[in-house]
Amino acid sequence: MRPTPILIVLVFTWLGCRCTASHAQSAAEWQARQVEAAQKSEAIMLDANKRASLLAQFQVMRYAYIGNKDPAFQIIFGQYLSWYQSFIGDYQDAATSFSIRQEALPDDRPSPLDNPEFGAEPALTAIPRLARNHRAVFFNEAHNIPLTRTLTVQLLGKLRAEGFNYFAAETVYQTDTGLQSRGYPTKDSGFYTKEPICAEMVRTALRLGYKVIGYEALSNATGNAREAEQARNIYQQVFKHDPNAKLVVDAGYAHIQESGVYLGGSSMAEHLEKLIHIDPLTVEQTMLYEHPSSSDDHPYYGPAMRKLHPEEPLVFVSKAGKPWSLRPGYDVSVWFPPQVIRRSRPTWLGLGGERKPYYVDGGRCNRHFPCLVEARYANEGSDAIPADRVVLDPVPLNAVPSDRVKASDLHPFSDLYLRPGKYRLTYSDADGTTLFSQNIAIKDQGDASLEAQPGHAGDSSTAIAEPCASAGSRPASQQAAQASCNR
């Protein structure tokens, strides 16, 4: 994945006019500042990636952001920072660092709430039904909002049951030739696969028996040429040798739109349709979700949430079976419910109940903060992207270095979200040094939110996650957290 060329174009499109007005300068001057900011951002990211540990890379990124207050830099670099915040499991800050306002547009279709012909359905049941008459299903995502990957992860099994057998992900590197046989992604598998939900999407596809491919352009092409090359790569790897294939695609934003001008030409989806002459089901997931500021939500979003109070992603389908989409170019739009935060983490990490919360606190960090906690599947190598990770720190992750001396709470706590099974749990510092490790098992039933029993650095003992205990039965350092156990 090559994020920079598309990044600049998108920021100009989404944010440029608003910022130009506020800074009273010409559009050309503002664009020049953004280009300069993009070059700085790329250089900072390259420097950060020289660090061995992900946490050290994040430290470089966050302090670079704090240290440069130029509005053009903060807008551009905010997206870079948000990627790394998502990589370390800091999903709330990732959403805040780069938020795209979803304004009403002239070609928006009327709200389905105003049409009695349309009814809301759980996306998990409606989309597989809608996909039955299609040979390809395209999902899009907002790269810094892993919420927009969660439904795709949950749908892979249902689509596999409908005969879909190829999974193409924009982010997967074609150079990772061992991905299929290995069965899990590593840091060399892709750019966004460094984020645990994205990695879980690829891992799930592999586990279900999909043939997983990457299709990003290998040349330096941009715009329409890049879209066309992506489409050719999918055709060469899938339909050229398997004309009866059924394909699931994960791509960013408008790469999946089926009509209209995209980056001065056509989208990847449009180019692919011309090559294979099949009509995909296109599922839009980046416009109708809760933003950090409600002023960034699409005007349809709030009224729908207040009326329906959903607890899972929804789509609208007419009585005649036709799905509703917000804009032309897509077949169906997904509405994500407002997120619920538990111990500083969104509960959508539970993937609709497939994963359980597992309590962790800073006692095992031995006063080394920030401290990265990761859980890897026991049957995967140490190079695997973890099933989940979270950073424990007594100061906010967007704080400046001087704030660290003010911190008094040395036992920050949070939750990891894990499927039933066995894991290797590790705590490490910014240098990548392991501070504590333990084997844990998540039971198939119950709320797995009880902390494992204390161990030592390098300890390989096993702990079993149990349902929430009463506050009195737990160590004093954990009793404050217990109050939120069943929220």
Regions found by a protein language model. Give the residues of each.
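Bacterial N-terminal signal peptides that target proteins for export
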Residues: M1-L7
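Intrinsic disorder/low-complexity detector
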Residues: L7-I8, Q479
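Compositional signal for N-terminal targeting/processing segments
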Residues: C17-R487
